[in-house]
Amino acid sequence: MKQLLDFLPLVIFFAVYKFFDIYIASGALIAATALQLIVTYALYKKLEKMHLITFAMVTVFGTLTLVFHDDSFIKWKVTIIYSLFAIALGVSQLLNKSILKSMLGKEMQVEDKIWARVTWYWVVFFASCGLVNIYVAFSLPLETWVNFKVFGLTALTLINTVLTVFYLYKHLPEDQRKELK
C-alpha cells in the first residue's frame, strides 16, 4: 500500500497533463503530493524525510511554475531532487553512516564494503538521472519530457532497485540467503 501511495502524485500529474496542460498538472501534483502526505500519516502515523523533502520541492517548484507560467521550474525540480538524493547518499557514505545500510541493514546483513559499493552506485545513478533529465527537459518537446519523467525515470529506478537487491542477495551470508528462499 505504501509503495502505491508513492506513485499517486506521479499518476495524477501524468493524467492531468494528458487531459489539460503542464500548469494544471503542476497544481494537481502539489495537491496530490499533499494528499499523499495526509494519507500516509493517517495510515502509518509517521512521515519519512524523503516524502517531506519531495513535498517541499514539489510545492516550491510547482508554485513557481504556476506563478511565472514557466514550465522550466517543474522540469528543474526533478534534477534538484535527484541531485539532493545523490548528495545525501554520498555525504552519508563519506561520514561512514550509510543511509542505505540504515534503511535495509536489518533485513540484509552484508559487509560495510558492499553497502559502500551499493551507495556509490546509487549516487552515480541519481546524478546521472539528474543530468539526463536536464537534457530531456530542455532539448526535447514537453510531452517527451513528461513521458520520460513518468515512465523512463520510474522504469530506471525500478530496474536499479531490482539490480541492487540481486547484488545484495549475492553477498548475503549463506544462512540469511536460506531464510529468504
UniProtKB/Swiss-Prot annotation:
Its main location: membrane. GO terms for cellular component: plasma membrane. It is a multi-pass membrane protein. The keyword Cell membrane applies. It is found in: Cell inner membrane. The chain crosses the membrane at residues 10-30, 50-70, 80-100, 118-138, 148-168. The keyword tRNA-binding does not apply. Keywords: Cell inner membrane, Cell membrane, Membrane, Transmembrane, Transmembrane helix. NCBIfam families: ispZ (TIGR00997), PRK00259.1-2 (NF001324), PRK00259.1-3 (NF001325). HAMAP family: YciB. Plays a role in cell envelope biogenesis, maintenance of cell envelope integrity and membrane homeostasis. Belongs to the YciB family. This is Inner membrane-spanning protein YciB. It comes from Shewanella baltica (strain OS223). The gene is yciB.
